[in-house]
Amino acid sequence: MSPSHFAILFIIVISLVPLHGYANGQGFDANKLGSSVCHLGKCPKHREEVCYCCFNDRSRCYRSLYKCVAVCNRLVH
């Protein structure tokens, strides 16, 4: 492999590192947002399962934090 090919490959690999960090950061932001409108608890229908429920309406529970945040944000605003 010539030095110019190696340099191009190196630049491409280095440029992918911030994208990886950005993808990981999205999950953390969603958890921060979710903690303001949803709480983690046992599902009302299935006590052994864990769900995310709206703070304002505890009967609205979802297995996905993203779904809970989407629905509960509409209830708040």
Curated annotation (Swiss-Prot):
The keyword Electron transport does not apply. Residues 1-25 form the signal peptide. Disulfide bonds join 38-53, 43-72, 51-68, 54-61. Keywords: Disulfide bond, Signal. The keyword Signal applies. GO terms for biological process: pollen-stigma interaction. Belongs to the MEG family. This is EMBRYO SURROUNDING FACTOR 1-like protein 6. It comes from Arabidopsis thaliana (Mouse-ear cress). The lineage of its organism: Eukaryota, Viridiplantae, Streptophyta, Embryophyta, Tracheophyta.
